[in-house]
């Protein structure tokens, strides 16, 4: 056995991955219920084993070095395999004693906790953990075996994964209630050709849907402002900075309070699909399989119940 393997411990890898995820020794210590000096000592011991620095500070921000980034990929996979081994042994027990880590695409955070609360009520003994991120993050977590299931929009065709549709995912055009076309019915998208569009960053799910819409309607917006989150876009829409295309499932609160209004553009809502995915090579534990089955059976009904009343006379799920 090499000196590297003799000196390396799973605890060191767990602490390293937690620090990397939070980009903070303090927050990692809080999650792991350790003191900050204990966390720092374990990372220093790991750096001694590796023989290279794993973290550095750039403009006051804790970031991974190149060796640290490489190790993070392997450490995540190792810890994922250990988790799988533990769950495989637990599989001979009861589904109620398992654990699940589910990855949520950012847009789904508006409804997924309430949806999953129904699952945890049925299976109170299951340890459910949630990881949230953008599409790129979820793809990496799936590939690294760091999550069991992923709830996302576009299926992960980049990976050898199993992806199953679970519900409709409508996207709608929204504006301030003070917009001149707020009360217009079934007007053409070209009526918005002079408007400023507030969109997510290129590569995000909602940005991709917007670009498809523009292409299909031979439409070029007068101006596009790129914003980094749905929350920022919603605040900008409320302030009258422009209009946006967003998932209906991000707008429950604002539509109910009247702070944001729907634009009744012909051809909307634009329907996409929610999917639940896992790696083809992954053997789902009884708890994970139970959660997958729950999402397949209940998501469409749940979303229809929660959001169906927000678009009178228009199908949303």
Swiss-Prot record:
Residues making up the signal peptide according to the UniProt record: none
Domain HTH lysR-type: 8-65
Record's keyword terms, sorted: Activator, DNA-binding, Transcription, Transcription regulation
Superkingdom as given in the UniProt entry: Bacteria
The keyword S-adenosyl-L-methionine is annotated on this UniProt entry: no
Pfam families: HTH_1, LysR_substrate
Alphabetized InterPro entries for the sequence: LysR_subst-bd, Tscrpt_reg_HTH_LysR, WH-like_DNA-bd_sf, WH_DNA-bd_sf
A molecular function (GO) term: transcription cis-regulatory region binding
PROSITE patterns: HTH_LYSR (PS50931)
PANTHER family: HTH-TYPE TRANSCRIPTIONAL ACTIVATOR CMPR, HTH-TYPE TRANSCRIPTIONAL REGULATOR
Protein name from the UniProt record: HTH-type transcriptional regulator CfxR
Record organism: Cupriavidus necator (strain ATCC 17699 / DSM 428 / KCTC 22496 / NCIMB 10442 / H16 / Stanier 337)
Gene expressing this chain: cfxR
């Amino acid at each position: 056995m090499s000196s590297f393997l003799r000196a390396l411990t799973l605890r060191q890898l767990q602490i390293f991955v937690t620090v990397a995820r939070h980009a903070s020794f303090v927050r990692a210590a809080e999650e792991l219920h350790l003191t900050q000096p204990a966390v720092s000592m374990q990372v220093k011991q790991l750096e001694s084993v590796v023989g290279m620095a794993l973290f550095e500070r750039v403009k006051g921000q804790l970031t991974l070095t190149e060796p640290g980034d490489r190790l993070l990929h392997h450490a995540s996979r190792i810890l994922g395999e250990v988790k799988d081994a533990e769950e495989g042994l637990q599989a001979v027990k009861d589904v109620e004693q398992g654990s699940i880590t589910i990855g949520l695409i950012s847009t789904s955070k508006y409804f997924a906790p309430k949806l999953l609360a129904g699952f945890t009520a049925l299976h109170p003994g299951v340890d459910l953990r949630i990881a949230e991120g953008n599409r790129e993050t979820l793809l990496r977590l799936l590939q690294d075996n760091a999550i069991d299931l992923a709830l996302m929009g576009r299926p992960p065709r980049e990976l050898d994964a199993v992806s199953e549709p679970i519900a409709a995912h409508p996207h709608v055009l929204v504006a301030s209630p003070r917009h001149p076309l707020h009360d217009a019915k079934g007007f053409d998208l070209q009526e918005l050709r002079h408007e400023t569009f507030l969109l997510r960053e290129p590569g995000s799910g909602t940005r991709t849907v917007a670009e498809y819409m523009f292409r299909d309607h031979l439409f070029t917006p007068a101006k596009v402002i790129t914003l980094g989150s749905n929350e920022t876009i919603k605040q900008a829409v409320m302030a009258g900075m422009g209009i946006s295309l967003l998932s209906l499932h991000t707008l429950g609160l604002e539509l109910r309070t009247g702070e944001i209004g729907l634009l009744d553009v012909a051809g909307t809502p634009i329907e996409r699909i929610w999917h639940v995915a896992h790696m083809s090579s992954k053997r789902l534990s009884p708890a994970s399989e139970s959660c997958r089955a729950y999402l397949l059976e209940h998501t469409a009904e749940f979303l229809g119940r929660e959001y169906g009343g927000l678009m009178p006379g228009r199908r949303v799920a």
